Amino acid sequence: MHAVRRAIISALLLACAGLSGAAQARPQDTALRVVVPMLHPSAREHASYFPRLLQLALDKTMATDGPYEIVHYDRELTSPRQALEIKHGGVIDVMWDGTNRQREAELLPIRISLLQELNDYRVLLIRRSDAARFANIRNLEQLRMLKAGAGVNWPSTDVLRANGLPVVTSIGYEYLFPMLRVGRFDYMPRGVHEAWSELQQHANDGFDIEPNIFLHYRVPYYFFVSRTRPELAARIERGLKLAQKDGSFDALFNAIPAFQRGMAEIAAKKRRVFELKVP
């Protein structure tokens, strides 16, 4: 009888110890795990801005929503593949990219522009040998005589084509630069925050940035999550708004040299602005 009583007491003590351990482990066990796209080692200087901004948003909501963990997926995914994975509950939970109708129909956007107005202004990456050719372009009709290069699934590709600008596409971003070099197309519209770092990376390819033209069209850059994860979207949105309110969003944005360069280029107002309609 005493042996049975001792066994019962021992079992109760073990159960209590187990509950205590579970309580101590609970914050880690229930932490929100957010898988984001891999950042390629050769990614441009501003690429880390997006996961850092996501981290900032989740930090701002820890008091109300609990702990979290951001994990980078271990393989590189194209933007269309990222969207497909999120849509079907695959290997990543959040992506960041320019928006379009299809993406917003399939995924859930957090409608706070991550790049402010930077993604709305495009400069033209051209062959240096074509500088005089572009110097004579005064309007959109003249630009339509030349061919642009862009990614096959980029939101910008739809905008260019909708405005009558011929576009040669590539399935991979990295293939566009050799295509420009050998004359497959005449220019690459690049975000005003992207072009100068790309020019530096391809310093030996004979490229230049056309100095007189802006293409202007509004393609906000958003975080996207699955339509089955509205609670994640709501948390990110609340966190971003809190960061906007206390100034930490702008502080992170303004700490990126490429963003500073882009905003200065917009503010200078030295370029002709060709307005494009977004379909």
Cite the ranges covered by each PLM segment.
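Extracytoplasmic small-molecule ligand-binding "clamshell" domains
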Residues: 27-106, 236
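Short loop->beta-strand "edge-of-pocket" segments that line small-molecule binding or catalytic clefts
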Residues: 30-47, 136-153, 186-187
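Short helices/loops that flank or line small-molecule/ion binding pockets
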Residues: 72-92, 162, 174-193, 202
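A ligand-binding cleft/hinge motif common to bilobed small-molecule-binding domains
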Residues: 86-87, 94-106, 187-214
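A conserved helix-loop-strand patch within extracytoplasmic ligand-binding domains
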Residues: 114-158
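Ligand-binding clefts/hinges and TM-proximal coupling segments of bilobed small-molecule sensing domains
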Residues: 151-162, 240-279
